[in-house]
Amino acid sequence: PIMFHAMAVAKPLMEKYGETHAIVGLLHDAYENPWNTEADFVGCGEIFGPEVEAAVRAVTKAEGEHYLEEYIPRCFANPIAKLVKVTDLENNYNGLHTIPNPDDRVRLTAKYGTALEMAGE
């Protein structure tokens, strides 16, 4: 379930960087739905503050945004979002062995590996 992934991303962030990073880790996939609106991001900021809102915006891939050419550089421009995304990528990368389709494993290995290289990891 998606909540377990969010918790797996948030836990090491909490241990290394604290509450702000952990909150963004918990929310890092929450806004990647077509039904989310600008008001949802504003609401996030009202609840958790502008630093969390900015990082959640940065870590949220926009519909139609090219992953490696647009999204990853934009995400990595925000220091909190970058740490969250790297933790997310590491979690995803470490779980690739559970994906049954070998073509999907190869594609995602390349995608996550390239993004981690872009982060300097």
Name these PLM-found stretches.
Residues P1-E121:
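Active-site helical microenvironments for divalent-metal-assisted chemistry
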